[in-house]
């Protein structure tokens, strides 16, 4: 098995020495890139794009041609699992995801399909295999899924929302039904991530975008317990190498210790948490990823560089930090500002501790 030419991202996730802080960007493949917008015109809708392996592979590679990033993330969408379960999913250009048959009763949950993941979502695994070949071991490839709670939010609400009131009300009105839905999603997510690893993903990540909407008790019951189940059952070793697992709960800083104890290797932070304080809270249990406010990328290179250095200083010396945004990059972000961010992180964080490819010896 050939080793990666640049493995500092994996080394940082495992809290091993690195020569500098690795950097990648959530939604680094996407609408802020003119070449992506041109590529997107080849198909009539977003899900058709995701389901075309050659296009998904090309979109994954595009940001690496512009910026010296330390990881690639496969181009896909978190709603691929609900789509495979038979919900009537439509991605509206100005609205976002719309599910025309929302799941709001025991009967609705029972009607959901439990497909063979490797067949129903084969397009994603084909895209991963194409991307792994194209990357030629240059950087690690991240696979991902949405958390069961976040997927259930869209499936029950029927569309995106700032509050997901329908989903949250169901937790109180029909808790058993909601748990049944979450368990189905968890079972499929485990199979989905394992199939991504089998196809060639080096790291996997779970996006719990809406976990921060919950009370502490409900977060544990309806989100974190299922994340912990996934952590326990996802493949964590392949060909003698560890497959790191990242959990990201937006607005989850108040539960940082609990997330760190859930079985993941790294915790993603949004911009509302001080990363230096977060490091002191978790100690050496997990690595941390984040956590620049995406809004600052709409300012200017000087402000971006200052803010990036502030985060690096707050984290302090040593490994265990992956630089990223605190959420996905905004589509209106100027490309030159992304370049300024990557350059600032790389220039400030050089540590010269060990050769970067020693993990794969």
From Swiss-Prot:
Catalytically driven reaction(s): uroporphyrinogen III + 4 H(+) = coproporphyrinogen III + 4 CO2
Site feature Transition state stabilizer: at which residues?
77
One example of the protein's molecular function in GO is: uroporphyrinogen decarboxylase activity
Q: Which PROSITE patterns match?
A: UROD_1, UROD_2
Q: Which GO terms describe its cellular component?
A: cytosol
Record carries keyword Cytoplasm: yes
Instruction: Provide one Gene Ontology biological process annotation.
Output: protoporphyrinogen IX biosynthetic process from glutamate
Amino acids binding substrate: 27-31, 77, 154, 209, 327
Q: Which family does it belong to?
A: Belongs to the uroporphyrinogen decarboxylase family.
What the entry lists under NCBIfam families is as follows: hemE
Record note on quaternary structure: Homodimer.
Name listed for the protein in its UniProt record: Uroporphyrinogen decarboxylase
Print the organism lineage: Bacteria, Pseudomonadati, Pseudomonadota, Gammaproteobacteria, Legionellales
Q: Which gene encodes it?
A: hemE
């Amino acid at each position: 098995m050939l080793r990666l030419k640049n493995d500092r991202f994996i080394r940082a996730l495992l809290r091993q020495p690195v020569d500098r802080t690795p950097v990648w960007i959530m939604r680094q493949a996407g609408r802020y890139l003119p070449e992506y917008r041109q590529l997107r015109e080849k198909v009539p809708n977003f899900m058709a794009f995701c389901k075309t392996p050659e296009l998904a592979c090309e979109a994954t590679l595009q940001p690496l041609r512009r910026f010296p990033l330390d990881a690639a993330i496969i181009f896909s969408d978190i709603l691929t699992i609900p789509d495979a379960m038979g919900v009537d999913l439509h991605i509206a250009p100005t609205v976002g995801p719309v599910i025309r048959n929302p799941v709001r009763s025991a009967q609705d949950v029972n009607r959901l399909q439990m497909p063979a993941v490797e067949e129903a979502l084969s397009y994603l695994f084909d895209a991963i295999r194409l991307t792994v070949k194209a990357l030629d071991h240059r950087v690690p490839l991240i696979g991902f899924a949405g958390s069961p709670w976040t997927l259930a939010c869209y499936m029950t609400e029927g569309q995106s929302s700032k509050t997901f009131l329908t989903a949250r009300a169901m937790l109180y009105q029909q808790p058993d039904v909601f748990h049944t839905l979450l368990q189905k999603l968890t079972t499929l997510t485990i199979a989905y991530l394992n199939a991504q690893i089998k196809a060639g993903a080096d790291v996997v990540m779970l996006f719990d975008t809406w976990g921060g909407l919950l009370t502490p008790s409900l977060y544990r019951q309806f989100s974190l317990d299922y994340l912990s189940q996934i952590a326990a059952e996802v493949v964590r070793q392949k060909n003698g190498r560890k497959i790191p697992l990242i959990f990201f709960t937006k607005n989850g800083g108040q539960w940082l210790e609990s997330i760190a104890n859930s079985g993941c290797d790294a915790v993603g932070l949004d911009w509302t948490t001080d990363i230096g304080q977060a490091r002191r809270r978790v100690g050496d249990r997990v690595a941390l990823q984040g956590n620049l406010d995406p809004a600052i990328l709409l300012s200017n290179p000087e402000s971006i560089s200052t803010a990036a250095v502030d985060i690096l200083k707050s984290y302090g010396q040593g490994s265990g930090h992956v630089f990223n945004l605190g959420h996905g990059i905004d589509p209106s972000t100027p490309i030159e500002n992304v370049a300024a961010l990557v350059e600032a992180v790389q220039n400030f964080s050089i540590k010269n501790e060990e050769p970067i490819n020693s993990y794969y010896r």
